[in-house]
Structure formats: structure tokens, C-alpha cells
């Protein structure tokens, strides 16, 4: 096992255990709004602290980028840990048992290690660049769909970017005519992990942040899939507009989305 994967798994499990314990005691959860339709809890912050502490013990010099604390610069800028301590906070607050810890390690701009941990199902999705993706140690392969016929597509509403609501609904309408059904679960990290596992055939979302998809992107790639922006390029790290699936599914999704995109979403 890659030494950084070992630490990422340890950190994810520790944070996941903390989250699961707090899920059982909802009276101890304190939620607040940090932005439009964007929530944070004391559990997000406590889970983040556990992850940072675990990383710092082994790699004190590395840079850490987190959803709640921003960038914590280390002396080694080439190695960045990109963390979402609780992806699916709204689900957690509402006691919907679908959320995850997401940890990725980027070295010189390339994601090398990924962990997405679902503490409620005890499902640990892991990947190391060039060595495949696993779920609880078993090798993952994505969907073998050849087109959109019969596919299940996952997505997330652009609740932080409602200016795109009409465009988004138009894209959904276009894809709905081609696929079998949609799933909207509330955790982009798990959506991407499910693409890697073949549980859903494709995924798209507008305006994600790097910590939402950094780990999931590598899971998809290592399970034989591809990830692109809405025009088939690689600008999603900047825009957060992301499409994922096997190459044929992504190609078909992009073809259906193309005519519905506003200029802002073509970047």
C-alpha cells in the first residue's frame, strides 16, 4: 500500500467513526449556515481536526486544503492533501444516512491517492494512480454501458449557483429522454465512487469545489472511466463543472448537453 494511502485511510476511518457516533446523538450536533444554502456543523469541524492531526503526525511539512479551513500551507507545496471531512452535510443534518469523508493527495498537480469512506455502510473506496480502484479491498470496474439507453445517471442540483437553474433543468430534460432514470443523493464524493463501482453509469454537476471531487475523480479513472468538463476538456478543476463515466457514456452525455449550455458553462 502507498504510504500516503495508509495515512489517508487511517484519517478517513477516524473521522468516519467520529461522524457515525455523532449521527447517533443528534442533540449534540450544532448546525450553522456559512453561505447561501450551504451549511456546516460542529461535526464537520471536529472531523476535519481529526484528519489534519492524523496527517500532520506523519507529514508535518505537507500542504492541506480543506473545505472548512481553506489552505494550510506547509513547507512542501508540491504535496497537497485535499479534504472534505463530511461530504453530504445537509444529509447528515437531516439524518439521511448518506455522506462520506473524502481525502485526496495531489503531488505536483496530479492526484495520486484517493479515499472516500462511507461510515454508515462501512464502505471504503480507495485508489492509487496506476494501481486501480478498490472497495473494501475488492477491485472496482465501472459500468460497461455502450450508450445512454438503460443507464442510471447521478447528479446534484446547483443549489449554490441557482443562476444556472434553467440551464440545468434543460440539461436534465435532454438526458432524461435518453437514459432510464436519475439519482440525486446529496454527496458528490459518493456519486463518483458509485460511478467507479458501476452502481450508476454516469454523473454530472455544476460548480463543484476541488474537495468535492478530488478523490472521486481518481476513483473513476482507476476504474476505467474518464472525467471531463462540459465541453469534453480538462477545465473542471477550475470551473467545477464535471461529467464522469465510461468513455462512451461521457461522450453521449456531452453530445446531449452541448446545445443546452450557456456561454458561462462552456468554459
Swiss-Prot record:
Changing residue 173 to V: No growth at 30 degrees Celsius, IMPase activity not inhibited by RNA polymerase (RNAP). Transmembrane segments: none annotated. Its main location: cytoplasm. Optimum pH is 7.8. SUPFAM superfamilies: Carbohydrate phosphatase. Disruption phenotype: Conditionally lethal, cells are unable to grow at 30 degrees Celsius and less, grow poorly at 37 degrees Celsius, but do grow at 42 degrees Celsius. Pfam families: Inositol_P. GO terms for biological process: inositol metabolic process; phosphatidylinositol phosphate biosynthetic process; ribosome biogenesis; signal transduction; transcription antitermination. Inhibited by Li(+). Li(+) binds to Asp-84, Asp-87 and Asp-212. One of its GO terms (molecular function) is glycerol-2-phosphatase activity. Keywords: Chaperone, Cytoplasm, Hydrolase, Magnesium, Metal-binding, Ribosome biogenesis, RNA-binding, Transcription, Transcription antitermination, Transcription regulation. It is found in: Cytoplasm. Optimum temperature is 80 degrees Celsius, 90% of activity remains after heating at 70 degrees Celsius for 5 minutes. Its cofactor is Mg(2+). Belongs to the inositol monophosphatase superfamily. Monomer. A monomer-dimer equilibrium. Homodimer. The rRNA transcription and antitermination complex (rrnTAC) consists of RNA polymerase (RNAP), NusA, NusB, NusE (rpsJ), NusG, SubB, ribosomal protein S4, DNA and precursor rRNA; S4 is more flexible than other subunits. Binds to RNAP, which decreases IMPase activity against 1D-myo-inositol 1-phosphate. Association with rRNA gene-transcribing RNAP is dependent on NusB. Interacts with AR2 domain of NusA; crystallizes as a 2:1 SuhB:NusA heterotrimer. This is Nus factor SuhB. It comes from Escherichia coli (strain K12). The gene is suhB.
Amino acid at each position: 500500500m502507498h504510504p500516503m494511502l495508509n495515512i489517508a485511510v487511517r484519517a478517513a476511518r477516524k473521522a468516519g467513526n467520529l461522524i457515525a457516533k455523532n449521527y447517533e446523538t443528534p442533540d449534540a450536533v450544532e448546525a450553522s449556515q456559512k453561505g447561501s444554502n450551504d451549511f456546516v456543523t460542529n461535526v464537520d469541524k471536529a472531523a476535519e481536526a481529526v484528519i489534519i492531526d492524523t496527517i500532520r503526525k506523519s507529514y508535518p511539512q505537507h500542504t492541506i486544503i480543506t473545505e472548512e479551513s481553506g489552505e494550510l500551507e506547509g513547507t512542501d507545496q508540491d504535496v497537497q492533501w485535499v479534504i472534505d471531512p463530511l461530504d453530504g452535510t445537509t444529509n447528515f443534518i437531516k439524518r439521511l444516512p448518506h455522506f462520506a469523508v473524502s481525502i485526496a493527495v495531489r503531488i505536483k498537480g496530479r492526484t495520486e491517492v484517493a479515499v472516500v469512506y462511507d461510515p454508515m455502510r462501512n464502505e471504503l473506496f480507495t485508489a492509487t494512480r496506476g494501481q486501480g480502484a478498490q472497495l473494501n479491498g475488492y477491485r472496482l470496474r465501472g459500468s460497461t454501458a455502450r450508450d445512454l439507453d438503460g443507464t442510471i445517471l447521478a447528479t446534484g442540483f446547483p443549489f449554490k449557483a441557482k443562476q444556472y437553474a434553467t440551464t440545468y433543468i434543460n440539461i436534465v430534460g435532454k438526458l432524461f429522454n435518453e437514459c432510464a432514470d436519475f439519482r440525486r443523493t446529496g454527496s458528490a464524493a459518493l456519486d463518483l465512487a458509485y460511478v467507479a463501482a458501476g452502481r450508476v453509469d454516469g454523473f454530472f454537476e455544476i460548480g463543484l469545489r476541488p474537495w468535492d471531487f478530488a478523490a472521486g475523480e481518481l476513483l473513476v479513472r482507476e476504474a476505467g472511466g474518464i472525467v471531463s468538463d462540459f465541453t469534453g476538456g480538462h477545465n473542471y478543476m477550475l470551473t467545477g463543472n464535471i461529467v464522469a463515466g465510461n468513455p462512451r457514456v461521457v461522450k453521449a452525455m456531452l453530445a446531449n448537453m452541448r446545445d443546452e449550455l450557456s456561454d458561462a458553462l462552456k468554459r
